[in-house]
Amino acid sequence: MGKQCFVTGRKASTGNRRSHALNSTKRRWNANLQKVRILVDGKPKKVWVSARALKSGKVTRV
């Protein structure tokens, strides 16, 4: 599985990088994902979780 939040499903989004002359090239905005150990089905597991989910208390570390 790729880098995606285990709880909220947040992942990198895409858009355009714009120069001063308004030329455009593709770029990515990466979500603030942290690798943490949480309980999944009663067992500790290392998963990617967004910082927003950690701060809001949607998951607790083991």
Swiss-Prot record:
GO terms for cellular component: ribonucleoprotein complex; ribosome. One of its GO terms (molecular function) is structural constituent of ribosome. Keywords: Ribonucleoprotein, Ribosomal protein. It comes from the Bacteria. HAMAP family: Ribosomal_bL28. It holds the Pfam family Ribosomal_L28. The lineage of its organism: Bacteria, Bacillati, Bacillota, Bacilli, Bacillales. GO terms for biological process: translation. This is Large ribosomal subunit protein bL28. It comes from Staphylococcus aureus (strain NCTC 8325 / PS 47). InterPro entries: Bacterial_rp_bL28 (IPR050096), Ribosomal_bL28 (IPR026569), Ribosomal_bL28/bL31-like_sf (IPR034704), Ribosomal_bL28_bact-type (IPR001383), Ribosomal_bL28_sf (IPR037147). Residues 1-22 are annotated as: Disordered. The keyword Nucleus does not apply. The keyword Ribonucleoprotein applies. Gene3D superfamilies: Ribosomal protein L28/L24. Belongs to the bacterial ribosomal protein bL28 family.
